Swiss-Prot record:
Residues 412-429, 542-554 have a biased composition (Polar residues). It comes from Mus musculus. Disruption phenotype: No visible phenotype; mice develop normally and live to old age. E2f7 and E2f8 double knockout embryos die by 11.5 dpc of massive apoptosis and dilation of blood vessels and show increased expression of E2f1 and p53/Tp53, as well as many stress-related genes. Gene3D superfamilies: Winged helix-like DNA-binding domain superfamily/Winged helix DNA-binding domain. In contrast to classical members of the E2F transcription factor, atypical members contain 2 DNA-binding domains and regulate transcription in a DP-independent manner. Both DNA-binding domains are required for DNA-binding and are proposed to form an intramolecular structure that is similar to the winged helix structure of the E2F-DP heterodimer. Belongs to the E2F/DP family. Its main location: nucleus. Residues 1-27, 38-57, 407-433, 532-616, 745-803 are annotated as: Disordered. The keyword Lipid metabolism does not apply. The modification Phosphoserine is found at residues 71, 102, 412, 416. Keywords: Activator, Cell cycle, DNA-binding, Nucleus, Phosphoprotein, Repressor, Transcription, Transcription regulation. This is Transcription factor E2F8. It comes from the Eukaryota. GO terms for biological process: cell cycle comprising mitosis without cytokinesis; chorionic trophoblast cell differentiation; fibroblast proliferation; hepatocyte differentiation; negative regulation of cytokinesis; negative regulation of transcription by RNA polymerase II; placenta development; positive regulation of DNA endoreduplication.
């Protein structure tokens, strides 16, 4: 039992869940009865009684409580001032009346709308003052006193005073104080308003609105927009789009609030409304037409339907005041769409001549155009008689605001011009090009002019000297010097054209400023060269010979097709003319399909070589060869200095040391192109302080004869070679200049040679009828030195072919080297690659369909 007591006491919230025993003892019931009164929270709470049934809790209950608490203090304060007797009794009486009476009874006890109407209020107001007051008596009006006497709000009195002020029946003295003038100036004012209305062409606007109403039916909003457009067109012509308040002479408004826009709106509208009655032929105006005309005072696009209705209500207020003055009366006009309320003019008949003096109003458009805006505002603001007061016209306020807005826009505008301004300026003015574009265009024009001048002068000199005629006999022992057309070699930068002797080309060379620097390679464009054709009876051949002192190893920097002579000359001249042209065309097509093109020049080896017979030279003399012209060229700097120039004009020495005459022939790989003797291609002696080492690199389709520069500055090389350029740079440069096709890749891997010694081919001493040769490869490299204008040049021995004229192997050589579609007597010229392996290129007509694999054993 004790445990049960503890459970019941400790967990009272579980009593409801506990089941009563089947046979509860009476003692347990007594214990529960004793515990029950002590457990107050366990009992069910009773519902609290409502404090106030008649006053429910509302969101403003606290506010009402505060007002009721503060109101005694307010009443005591009013009692101290002596005003609480009259004013406190009225709210108390109203409160008591409102408490005792219901809503309808309270409304009935208040003054009715008719009693509070503006017309009735205006009648009461006019009854207080005479129509024609005595000017000698004080006729001041205090609006506070009038509102208190008439028991109305002061704003209702303001509406009446504004309409009376528009007719100059009252004038404002100070705040809430006016002067009563009565009807003394009424006739004069009405005459003035009629003249102003005629100037504004209100009669025409009324007729136009009526005619459009008959033509089509539209609602208020659309008609507002259309009629505002008409009003703007008419008022824009007369300059009265925003007419100011029409004043009379002698009537002054000394307060600034008179000219404020907000207070002036009702007065100006009242004057315009009166004008409509005075100018209309049947002096009946409906409020709808009046609203359409008078609504042009404000911005019509900003007005919606509610504002339009507000204008109508304001017109009703004006009409009520004018009706109280017995100037108009309300009538109903019957139209097609029904009866409409309108007002008829019942005032005095006014003619424009009745006005004794001219009113002060906005000037006509002719005078307004002549005078400034400030003078116009001053005329509208001040009267001619009396002392002008310092009041601010609303137009001045607009002017100040516009100036402030402009200043704010200017100060906040970014420094950079706006895009729209740029577009407008670009349309009005011609576009200004960029400075870099101007410089590029100027440089391009100057280069074109400088490159075109040498061509013109070369053609003139060639025409004068008669180079297009058959050539004179060639002297193999005399080297004619190249002419320099312009003596501007001393200029730091310029294009110096090299005028050749009859069988060379004019190559413009750009001279750099620095006396020493990286070597340059001259590239000639292949498409502009003219080919030299031999006579049909002559078929010269070129066979490279092996030099003894100088070798033709390739420099890795000379990877992009360095050459001064061709592989060999073909016997295409024996073919007919169409076949020769076809061979030329095929050779041009197949040259771009190869991998890396290299043309090796063979140096004359000395007296061991076979000399050219005099018959061949004589036959060569009579060849009419037009001079090929290369109008443009490129200079590409190379990182490794070489001594290319002088060795093309060196007198080569053998072991015997006897100099050999400079009988060099620069051939072309195209069939039918005649070789040119090197005696006509001599060196140009450049000043050593102006020219850096040059590498002359000519494409095979344009190579006929190349002059080589010769200078002491070209002979000496750098003690240590510079870093070789990468193959990507070389390929990009050559492809950008258009010298190689995009598919051709030039290798720039370093090679064994430190310098390049071009080797010129020699004329093979053989008869024309028995031209037989066999190209053999010489495997043993020869190391030696050659004197280049007094400077020793070390050369790495390369494998050069040794010309052999076998007596009985003509058929084998012809069958071996014959190519399908090639020439009848093809020639071969091996060239040396960077790795030292020999490769053989056969003739100029390369057919990619057949690949010839030749081993050195077959050739030997």
């Amino acid at each position: 039992m004790e445990n049960q007591k503890e459970n019941l006491f400790s967990e009272p919230h579980k009593r409801g869940l506990m089941k009563s025993p089947l046979h509860p003892s009476s003692k347990a019931n007594m214990v529960l009865a004793e515990i029950q009164p002590d457990l107050g929270p366990l009992t069910t709470p009773t519902k609290p009684k409502e404090v106030s049934q008649g006053e429910p809790w509302t969101p403003t209950a606290n506010l009402k409580m505060l007002i009721s608490a503060v109101s005694p203090e307010i009443r005591s304060r009013d009692q101290k001032r002596g005003l609480s007797d009259n004013r406190s009794a009225l709210p108390e009486a109203r409160d008591c009346l409102h408490e005792h009476l219901s809503g309808d009874e309270f409304e009935k006890s208040q003054p009715s709308r008719k009693e509070k109407s503006l017309g009735l209020l205006c009648h009461k107001f006019l009854a207080r003052y005479p129509k024609y007051p005595n000017p000698a008596v004080n006729n001041d009006i205090c609006l506070d006193e009038v509102a208190e006497e008439l028991n109305v709000e002061r704003r209702r009195i303001y509406d009446i005073v504004n309409v009376l002020e528009s007719l100059h029946m009252v004038s404002r003295l100070a705040k809430n104080r006016y002067t009563w003038h009565g009807r003394h100036n009424l006739t004069k004012t009405l005459g003035t308003l009629k003249s102003v209305g005629e100037e504004n062409k209100y009669a025409e606007q009324i007729m136009m609105i009526k005619r459009k109403e008959y033509e089509q039916e539209f609602d208020f909003i659309k008609s507002c927009g259309i009629e505002d457009h008409v009003i703007k067109s008419h008022t824009g012509q007369n300059g009265h789009s925003d007419m100011c308040f029409v004043e009379l002479p002698g009537v002054e408004f000394r307060a600034a609030s008179v000219n404020s826009r907000k207070d002036k709106s009702l007065r100006v509208m009242s004057q315009k409304f009166v004008m409509l009655f005075l100018v209309s032929t049947p002096q009946i105006v409906s409020l709808e037409i009046a609203a359409k005309i008078l609504i042009g005072e404000d911005h019509v696009e900003d007005l919606d339907k509610s504002k339009y209705k507000t204008k109508i209500r304001r017109l009703y207020d004006i009409a009520n005041v004018l009706s109280s003055l017995d100037l108009i009366k309300k009538v109903h006009v019957t139209e097609e769409r029904g009866r409409k309320p309108a007002f008829k003019w019942t005032g005095p008949e006014i003619s424009p001549n009745n006005s004794g003096s001219s009113p002060i109003m906005p000037l006509p458009a002719s005078l307004e155009a002549e005078q400034s805006a400030k003078e116009n505002c001053a005329k509208n603001l001040f009267s001619t008689r009396g002392k002008p007061s310092f009041t601010r016209h609303p137009s001045l306020i607009k002017l100040v605001k516009s100036i402030e807005n402009d200043r704010r826009k200017i100060s906040s505008a970014p420094s950079s011009p706006v895009k729209s301004n740029k577009a407008e300026s670009s349309q009005n003015s011609p576009p200004v090009p960029n400075k870099m574009a101007q410089l590029a265009a100027i440089c391009k024009m100057q280069l074109e002019e400088q490159s075109s001048e040498p061509r013109k002068k070369v053609k003139v000199n060639l025409a004068r000297s008669g180079h297009y005629k058959p050539l004179a006999p060639l002297d193999p022992t005399v080297n004619t010097e190249l002419e320099l057309l312009t003596p501007s070699l001393i200029q730091p930068l310029g294009v110096v054209p090299l005028i050749p002797s009859p069988l060379s080309s004019a190559v413009p060379v750009i001279l750099p400023q620095a006396p020493s620097g990286p070597s340059y390679a001259i590239y000639l464009q292949p498409a502009q060269a003219q080919m030299l054709t031999p006579p049909p009876g002559l078929s010269p051949t070129v066979c490279p010979t092996q030099p003894s002192n100088a070798t033709g190893s390739k420099d890795p920097t000379d990877a992009p097709a360095e050459k001064t002579a061709t592989d060999a000359a073909t016997t295409g001249s024996l073919q007919p003319a169409p076949e020769r042209h076809g061979a030329k065309h095929r050779s041009k097509e197949t040259t771009g399909d190869r991998g890396t093109k290299r043309m090796i020049t063979a140096e004359d080896s000395g007296p061991s070589s076979v000399k050219k017979p005099k018959e061949d030279l004589k036959a060569l003399e009579n060849v009419p060869t037009p001079t090929p012209l290369f109008p443009s060229g490129y200079l590409i700097p190379l990182t490794q200095c070489s001594s290319l120039g002088p060795d093309s004009v060196l007198s080569n020495t053998e072991n015997s040391g006897t100099p050999s005459p400079n009988h060099r022939i620069y051939g072309s790989p195209i069939a039918g192109v005649i070789p040119v003797a090197s005696s006509e291609l001599t060196a140009v002696n450049f000043p050593p302080f102006h020219v850096t080492p040059l590498k002359l690199m000519v494409s095979p389709t344009s190579m006929a004869a190349v002059p080589v520069g010769n200078s002491p500055a070209l002979n000496s090389g750098h003690p240590a070679p510079a870093q070789n350029p990468s193959s990507a740079i070389v390929n990009f440069t050559l492809q950008h200049l258009g010298l190689i096709s995009p598919g051709v890749q030039m290798s720039a891997s370093p090679g064994p040679g430190a310098g390049t010694v071009p080797v010129s081919p020699r004329v093979e001493a053989d008869n024309l009828s028995s031209r037989q040769r066999r190209a053999t490869n010489h495997d043993s490299p020869v190391l030696g030195q050659s004197q280049l204008n007094g400077q020793p040049v070390a050369g790495t021995g390369a494998q050069q072919p040794v010309p052999v004229t076998p007596k009985g192997s003509q058929l084998v050589a012809e069958n071996f080297f014959r190519t399908p579609g090639g020439p009848t007597k093809p020639t071969s010229s091996p060239y040396t690659d960077f790795d030292g392996a020999n490769k053989t290129s056969f003739g100029t007509l390369f057919v990619p369909q057949r690949k010839l694999e030749v081993s050195t054993e077959d050739i030997h």
